[in-house]
Design a protein with these regions (language model features):
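N-terminal, active-site-proximal structural segment of metallo-dependent hydrolase catalytic domains
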Residues: 2-76, 89-93, 158, 263-268
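Active-site beta-strand/loop signature of hydrolases that rely on acidic residues for catalysis
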Residues: 22-29, 43-66, 100, 125, ...
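Short, solvent-exposed loop/turn elements at domain surfaces
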Residues: 31-37, 109, 207-209
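Structured beta-strand-rich core segments of catalytic domains in phosphoester-bond hydrolases
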Residues: 36, 54, 58-141, 236-244
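Metal-dependent phosphoester-hydrolase catalytic domains
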Residues: 165-173, 181-268
């Protein structure tokens, strides 16, 4: 009895502090299809709960009766944002990619990827994560599944890496988005020489071929094509999971893609 009483009054052990690092989300919004006013509330609630350091968004749209989706989410979250589109400012409809962050922005940029005829972009923010600069990039590569699509994605990856080399300096790099390619696809082989797959690094013992970021409600075959890549000599993936992989109501989904969340740790 005395031992039990003594144990009862011992102070609770403090939780182990997490090692310095950052969290990242990537998510294809499916633009304004299928009840965007309802979907955006579902997306907002999840992002509010997660409070990621940075968010990469694809298929972001802005139309006369649809406020820029990245701007709306950033405003509700209290985040800064960078929207990138090949559609010029002032155009009645603009479509592109975006980065959102709750961290101070040290630099920002954008780039139109080669081949220019495919109208693909990359957004860049350098953010301050508790005194550590980190470069985050968001992109969305060509969607074709044939040989020509692979060739185009290969060209886009080469141009993306060239842009990163010109803008990243010495700070760690995270690249997120909808790559329309499996992580081991030849299209991504050059990128994978230096950048790790956050989800695959964490779930090494799982049957990754059965994991899909395409919503199985819309697509029959599993396909993990949405990725968060991290610079392997600067960062380590500690946690990763899918987001929005359950309906928020019967037959209602946040998007035709699932999101990906990852927690990255700065390498010692």
């Amino acid at each position: 009895m005395l031992v039990a009483c003594a144990l009862a009054i011992l102070p609770a052990r403090a939780a182990e502090p997490q090692a310095p690092g950052m969290s990242m989300v990537t998510f294809n919004l499916h633009h304004d299809r299928e009840d965007w006013p309802q979907r955006r509330q579902v997306i907002l609630r999840e992002l509010e709960a997660l409070q990621p350091d940075a968010i990469a968004l694809q298929e972001v749209i802005q139309k006369p009766y649809v406020r820029n989706q990245a701007a709306w989410l950033a405003g509700k979250l209290g985040y800064d944002y960078q929207f990138v589109s090949t559609d010029p400012p002032g155009r009645f409809k603009r479509y592109g990619n975006a980065l959102l962050t709750r961290r101070p922005v040290l630099a920002r940029g954008e780039h139109l990827l080669a081949p220019r005829t495919d109208y693909r972009t990359v957004a860049h923010l350098r953010i301050d994560v508790d005194g550590q600069p980190v470069n985050v990039y968001a992109t969305h590569l060509n969607e074709r599944s044939d040989e020509n699509g692979g060739r185009i994605r290969g060209e886009q990856v080469a141009d993306l890496l060239k842009y990163i080399a010109a803008t990243s300096g010495d700070a760690p790099v995270v690249i997120a988005g909808d790559f329309n390619a499996l992580v081991d696809a030849g299209d991504l082989s050059v990128l994978r020489q230096r950048y790790g797959d956050s989800y695959g690094s964490v779930h090494v013992n799982n049957e990754l071929a059965q994991v899909s970021t395409l919503n199985r409600h819309y697509y029959e075959a599993p396909s993990r094509i949405d990725h968060i890549f991290f610079q392997q000599d600067q960062l380590v993936a500690r946690e990763a999971r899918l987001l929005f992989d359950q309906p928020y109501a019967e037959g209602r989904w946040a998007s035709d893609h699932y999101g990906v969340w990852a927690r990255l740790q700065f390498a010692p």
